[in-house]
């Protein structure tokens, strides 16, 4: 997958990320990855579900990856959960 087809989910409203996903597919992307960490994970799941159920009829979930990343903070190291949801055109 090309890294340009990745949407990083943060603190903006969900519909901003849905628009980014729909735009990627409308521009000819075969796959789009939605990535998030920590508190933004639920927003990433909402983004995928809204995009699939409301806007993208011919797109399916291909893979979902979950992991834990070690992040350096002021007080040491902490674990942060992350998710990657890969959407692809249905065949």
From Swiss-Prot:
GO terms for cellular component: chromosome; cytoplasm. InterPro entries: Alba-like_dom_sf, DNA/RNA-bd_Alba, DNA/RNA-bd_Alba-like. The keyword DNA-binding applies. Pfam families: Alba (PF01918). One of its GO terms (molecular function) is RNA binding. One of its GO terms (biological process) is chromosome condensation. The keyword Oxidoreductase does not apply. It is found in: Cytoplasm; Chromosome. Its main location: cytoplasm. Keywords: Chromosome, Cytoplasm, DNA condensation, DNA-binding. HAMAP family: AlbA. Binds double-stranded DNA tightly but without sequence specificity. Involved in DNA compaction. Belongs to the histone-like Alba family. This is DNA/RNA-binding protein Alba. It comes from Methanoculleus marisnigri (strain ATCC 35101 / DSM 1498 / JR1). The lineage of its organism: Archaea, Methanobacteriati, Methanobacteriota, Stenosarchaea group, Methanomicrobia. The gene is albA.
């Amino acid at each position: 997958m090309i890294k340009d087809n990745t949407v990083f989910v943060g603190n903006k409203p969900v519909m901003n990320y849905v628009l980014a996903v729909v735009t990627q597919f409308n521009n000819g992307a075969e796959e789009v990855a939605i990535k998030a960490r920590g508190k933004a994970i639920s927003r990433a799941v909402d983004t995928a579900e809204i995009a699939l159920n409301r806007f993208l009829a011919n797109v399916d979930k291909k893979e979902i990856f979950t992991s834990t990343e070690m992040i350096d903070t002021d007080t040491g190291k902490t674990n942060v959960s992350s998710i990657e949801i890969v959407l692809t055109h249905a065949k």
